[in-house]
Amino acid sequence: MSTPDRRRAVVTGLSVAAPGGLGTERYWKSLLTGENGIAELSRFDASRYPSRLAGQIDDFEASEHLPSRLLPQTDVSTRYALAAADWALADAGVGPESGLDDYDLGVVTSTAQGGFDFTHREFHKLWSQGPAYVSVYESFAWFYAVNTGQISIRNTMRGPSAALVGEQAGGLDAIGHARRTVRRGPGWCSAVASTRRSTRGASSSQLSGGLVSTVADPERAYLPFDVDASGYVPGEGGAVLIVEDADSARARGAERIYVRSPLRRDPAPGSGRPPALGRAAELALAEAGLTPADISVVFADGAGVPELDRAEADTLARLFGPRGVPVTAPKALTGRLCAGGGPADLAAALLALRDQVIPATGRHRAVPDAYALDLVTGRPREAALSAALVLARGRHGFNSAVVVTLRGSDHRRPT
């Protein structure tokens, strides 16, 4: 049995709900075929807005996946999280028959907005009709921790649980928190969920940050590391991963991929210190016991904002050398899913390790020479993959990095 300081956390199940891909394999196929999930907003009239595009999930019908009693009390983002948690737990084989105690099963979630759609609707009732018309479920449906609570209640997961807020890096932070939790107790297992809903208020409010693309063409609006990059497109969805104690996973025959995750905050503006993304990546490598030479592919944050792309490219060049490792940003096909983006990229990294292929950065034209990146473009690239680095950044200094390896970097595909 591993001692607490050496106990490994492994990913044993995953699921994705994202634009272009409802379900893990559908999502993976959409990335490999270059299916663009970005389109004009269809849930409200966006014609008056300077940005009218988003990555939307169009094929999710909540009543097909959840009991009717849950629908009046849940935001759409919570419905995504509940359905995806069901799929991930099934993928991991975690349930009553798995032999895991309820008090060893926990939930860690991250969201940057909470139940915004639900709140937007109920506040409209408050303003237009009065407080008597506001749903009693508003008391918790808006809350940042609601996904943790709803998943734990639905699946009788009574163990250590948490809700994190780390802007667009929050999803990877949740992975790190789950890893630390699992390492504290033999047999512990955490469901890690990060989902986001793209709404009228949430999408339009991002315009004030000055980083959202106003390009009208869905094929050219979000172009990470491209000469024509002009901002990002918001999207909805995310992923759920099951993080488990390796000894427990081994005992029940689960497939295993190792995961390590540190996080770092950017220094204060004007301090003269470099951004902390590189330090987060270095720590992820160190905790995984790897060097930059061991990394087969980087799933980049890919902001689509020239100055942010340049900063990330410089970080990768310092760490790996100019064009020293294949880099991809598959979120160009889905939009940035806020806290859900990191876990969706992590799911893609796990699938890339499984199938030994790197998905391309969609609709890319040309990398600026100054970036010195080996960016995977045009079509997927087959490669011998044993370890992947996944990066995520949020506004106001949030940075997170995760390293995943295939069966402990032994270059074997899972069976």
UniProtKB/Swiss-Prot annotation:
The keyword Transferase applies. GO terms for molecular function: 3-oxoacyl-[acyl-carrier-protein] synthase activity. This is Granaticin polyketide putative beta-ketoacyl synthase 2. Pathway: Antibiotic biosynthesis; granaticin biosynthesis. Its EC number is 2.3.1.-. It comes from Streptomyces violaceoruber. Belongs to the thiolase-like superfamily. Beta-ketoacyl-ACP synthases family. CDD domains: CLF. It is an enzyme of class 2 (transferase). This putative ketoacyl synthase lacks the active site cysteine. One of its GO terms (biological process) is fatty acid biosynthetic process. Keywords: Acyltransferase, Antibiotic biosynthesis, Transferase. It comes from the Bacteria. InterPro entries: Beta-ketoacyl_synthase, Ketoacyl_synth_C, Ketoacyl_synth_N, PKS_Beta-ketoAc_synthase_dom, Thiolase-like. The keyword Cell membrane does not apply. PROSITE patterns: KS3_2 (PS52004). Pfam families: ketoacyl-synt (PF00109), Ketoacyl-synt_C (PF02801). Residues 6-406 form the Ketosynthase family 3 (KS3) domain. PANTHER family: POLYKETIDE BETA-KETOACYL SYNTHASE 2-RELATED (PTHR11712:SF322), POLYKETIDE SYNTHASE-RELATED (PTHR11712). Gene3D superfamilies: 3.40.47.10.
